[in-house]
Amino acid sequence: GMYPLIQILAAKGYELSGSDVLDGSIIRYEREMGVKVSLGHNADNVVGADMVVYSAAISKDNVELNAAASYGIPTVERSVLLGYVSRLYKQSICVSGTHGKTTTTSMITTALELAGRDPSAVIGGKLPLINGYGKAGKGDDIVIEACEFAETFLKLTPYLSVVLNIDNDHLDYYGSMGELKFAFKRFALMTQFMIFANADDKNTMDVMYTLDRRVRTFAIDNHGDYRAVNINEYKPGFFEFDLKEWNTTDTTRIRLSVPGRHNIYNALAMCAVCRFVGLSADCLLYTSDAADE
């Protein structure tokens, strides 16, 4: 939703106003941040605004959008604003993939937070550690869940990007797997520094092999720069593994507190990103508060 973006922009000193049809705790929090929130949509609400941002749930004939058009005020969809926010930070970490985005974004945010880097975050699920769907930190990092629906992730400017997997999803929009893979290719090409990719996912690697970009891989079965070895189910449905890194013979034992073997891949992506940005191996142990997807 809009709330994490409001948190971030308010913290950076932007003057914000908005409207909603329902009152609640979120609106109370927004007002406490200094945001002027009106209940109900009204043409007068947009007077004086430099830009109007709307969510995908807002119809094109909304009275405020019509008023903005008549006043010559630019209007942009939320994903465009998210792209702008991604460029406000020195290091934007954008997590993409058909499955596992929320979990991995939460894991990376958790590790950075507990390492004292005070990241900002925009997450598709609620993260208990920060008691919300995002946060406005004071550090140089922002962690963003990058959704492929309707190509919204192509509005982002990742410094580092993650591609967890590419599976049959949103084909009603893309029309074919080929077009979906092409969208992920465009996302990867927008990455400014490093891409982290799942070497066990064929569709992901099909895309990576076409790129002239820096790529680090993570894997269980295939060769990867970051691998999970000595996997053990320490209690029903919960796994632990040794993290083997490309540049050292040392390993780190990682125990997951979120269930499911698939979360090994999400944890590997977290480990790869966090080690790359300079976190110690000990910091990778803190995944217990990550939200599951």
How should each PLM-predicted stretch be described?
Residues 258-269:
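Short glycine/threonine-rich catalytic loop with a Thr-x-Gly-x-Asp
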Residues 1-6:
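Glycine-rich adenosine-cofactor-binding loop
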Residues 286-293:
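Conserved small/polar residues in nucleotide/adenosyl-binding loops
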Residues 16-19, 121, 217:
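Short beta-strand "acidic-cap" motif of Rossmann-like dinucleotide-binding folds
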Residues 17-27:
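NAD(P)-binding Rossmann-fold cofactor-contacting core
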Residues 8-11, 28-31, 45, 56, ...:
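Phosphate-binding loop of NTP-binding sites
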